Amino acid sequence: YGYSVSPFIYLPAGADSGSSDPVQVQPDVTFSKVSPKIPSYSPLASFASTTLFSELPGNPSIYEDRYTVRAGRWPTAWNEAVLVLRPNGTMDDFLEYTLGLRDYAGLRSTVDKIASGESGTIEESHNTYTYDQLMSPTFKLVMPYQRYVWDGNLGVWTDKSDDQSYMNDLIANA
């Protein structure tokens, strides 16, 4: 499946993310406030421009022989995903937040502190998860055009991405 635009992917509100609002996980914006302030030697540097979702190549032979499916099957539809772990079965700490396995609200709070010049730390994870925990997240897909609404009075399209109520409804019904 090919996409000429990058979709927005959200973890729905209350999806074990510690957030009462949906969390935008693709493209991730958590570190946008602090990206320019993070030194390259900081453990946070690897999070500064994280993209965890990507399109599979059109030719399955490119990846099917390189990976072992431990459970389930390869995606066959545009709205399916595959979780790829490291060879030793571990994952990036940031992926735990994306999957709603760690408290996203706590992460954002720490990032906000760092952005305002305070000190903050993000604990490294050594958690172990079950198959059911890893497969439980349900993501919501929002195309960029859906974040705009026609304003007949002004004769323009209005970006509603900062309107939390609009976005909550849009994501809930996606």
Summary of predicted features, one role per range:
Residues 1-174:
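Basic-flanked hydrophobic alpha-helices used for secretion and membrane insertion
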